[in-house]
Structure formats: C-alpha cells, structure tokens
Amino acid sequence: MKKAIVVIIFFITNIVTLCLNFSVSPTKFEVDLSKDGTYEAYLLNNTPNPLRIEVYTEVPKGYEENNLNKNIVIYPKKISIKPGGKKEIRFKVKGIKNNDKKTYKTLLVFRESLPNIKEKIETRNSRVNMDLSFITEIAIGVYGK
C-alpha cells in the first residue's frame, strides 16, 4: 500500500513538471544581507522546441517597503535554451548596511518570451481548428535578513 502511494505521488509530481515548458531549480533562495553574494539558478527546457526566457524581479504583496529589487542584478536577463537543454542564470545581491534585522523579499520571475505568433486556422465544412499555446511564468522567492 505504501509503495502504491509513493508511486502515485511520484507520478503526479512528474506530470506537473512535464506540463510546464521549463523548470527552475532551486525554488527558493535565502540570502545573507550583511555581505554581497552571487547566486545561481538553473533552467531546464522540457519541450522539443527552443525557448526564449526573460528574467526580472517583482515586488510581492506586503513587501513594498522591504524588497530587494534595487539590490539585485541579474545576468543574463534574456536567454535561449535548446530543446532538452539546461542553462544557468546568475544574480548578485548587494548587501544592505544598517539592516535592522528586517526580512526582505523579492520575487525572481522567469517568463517565457512570446514566440513568433503563427496563427493556424483551418476552415473545413464550417468547422474551425485553432492551435493554442500557453506562456509559462514561474516566480521564486528571494528572502534576505
């Protein structure tokens, strides 16, 4: 019974991962704001097509005053990943002097860039077929103290 539950959980986890066009690891960063630091995230293309991904920061709700947007430098901001490929993205977090032990948070957003829009609409016998694609966007938290 336990084996069946483990297999089901493993199967569901893999289905969710494969449904996304790309995956990001790690899914959370905890940074030390007393000093500067460089961190790495890895992007994996789960599709048979090349992907273009844009990376930027966003302020989460409740952290309008205590965010790290001005302290984070991302490079590269736009990347291309071959089918089944893996790329590394780095970001530098500049330390905050006179930190009053507040918790700071910023979202690092990975957004798939729009591909060339190719509309494929076929009309046959008053039926319409249309291709639809989704744009994947993943946000991970960067926490600092």
Describe the function of each predicted region:
Residues 4-14:
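Sec-dependent N-terminal signal peptides
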Residues 19-46, 76-78:
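Beta-sheet-dominated interaction scaffolds and their linkers
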Residues 34-40, 87-88, 101-107:
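Short, solvent-exposed loop/turn segments enriched in Ser/Thr/Gly
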Residues 47-66, 110:
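Short acidic, flexible loop segments centered on an aromatic residue
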Residues 67-97:
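Intrinsically disordered, low-complexity Pro/Gly/Ser/Thr-rich segments with frequent PxxP/GP/PP motifs
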Residues 96-145:
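Terminal connector regions
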